[in-house]
């Protein structure tokens, strides 16, 4: 992995801030960063949690649930931009498919215990600023910029194992 020197980070952050002011910027969020969050779910009745990025904005969470015996499950979400006016940069994960049928509630409950997740009905709203902050160039963005940033589009790149999040400034 290439390392950027501090002055390169500042230049990169400045370029991104300028692109946000002008229009929008696409930020890749690696599958492994998202997987670290999901596998950290604090629920002893879940184990072997994995996250996989798939075609068409789909994110698949799978693992095992303790129901007397350990039962394998898989839950597929479609990642989309949140409705206009949603505070902060976030992505909505709409429930698409579950196997077995009873898997959705316990997966949503486990996700809802995480600080960056909010459960609304059968979908999860995920704050992505946490993942973006982990990227080196984000340190050099002007203070308070993330308060005005909104997600305008979401897609996936399964080949590179990334969630592609397009950011723009609110009202701009």
Name each model feature, range by range:
Residues 1-172:
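Extracellular/lumenal and peripheral-membrane lipid-interaction modules
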């Amino acid at each position: 992995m290439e390392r950027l020197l501090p002055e390169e980070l500042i230049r990169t952050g400045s370029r991104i801030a300028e692109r946000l002011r002008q229009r929008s910027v696409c930020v890749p969020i690696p599958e492994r960063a998202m997987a670290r969050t999901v596998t950290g779910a604090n629920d002893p009745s879940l184990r072997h949690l994995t996250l996989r990025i798939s075609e068409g904005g789909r994110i698949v969470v799978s693992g095992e649930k303790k129901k007397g015996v350990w039962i394998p499950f898989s839950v597929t979400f479609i990642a989309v931009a949140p409705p206009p006016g949603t505070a902060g940069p976030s992505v909505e994960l709409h429930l698409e498919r579950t196997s077995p049928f009873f898997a959705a509630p316990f997966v949503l409950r486990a996700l809802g215990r995480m600080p960056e997740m909010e459960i609304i009905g059968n979908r999860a709203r995920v704050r992505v600023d946490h993942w973006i902050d982990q990227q080196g160039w984000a340190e050099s963005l002007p203070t308070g910029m993330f308060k005005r940033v909104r997600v305008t589009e979401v897609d996936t790149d399964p080949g590179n194992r990334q969630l592609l999040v397009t950011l723009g400034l609110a009202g701009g």
